[in-house]
Amino acid sequence: MASKITIFFVLALVVVCTMMVCIPTATAELVLPCKTTYDCVNLPCLGRPPLCINGQCKCTTTLTHQAKLDNLRTMNDAKTCKYTSDCDPRMRYSCVSGSYICLNGFCTCT
């Protein structure tokens, strides 16, 4: 009977020690070979455009030239300003780039 209790405690000790050990996890990254950017259209980039860089498909975070121009357009209800400090600091959340300036008397996303 004592041997069964001993085995139970040893087994419980092994289980507790196993649960305390941190097992490192690896983050997986999808690597697709490519020759042109067209080869990367199936890469899941969550709204970011994929590009072929050094023979591998990569998700980019850069804005296109047109997106930057669209972001520069002032809104009809844009606040007037003399200095950038006159603009509402919460405006950065509505700008794609996250930054703004006082341009030609209006608070404008950059």
Curated annotation (Swiss-Prot):
Keyword Disulfide bond: yes
Compartments where located: Secreted
Alphabetic keyword roster: Antimicrobial, Disulfide bond, Fungicide, Plant defense, Secreted, Signal
Cleaved signal peptide residues: 1-28
GO cellular component terms, semicolon-separated: extracellular region
Disulfide bridge map: 34-52, 40-57, 45-59, 81-102, 87-107, 95-109
Gene Ontology BP annotations: defense response to fungus; killing of cells of another organism
Family statement drawn from the similarity comment of this UniProt entry: Belongs to the DEFL family.
Protein name (Swiss-Prot/TrEMBL): Defensin-like protein 296
Species the sequence originates in: Arabidopsis thaliana (Mouse-ear cress)
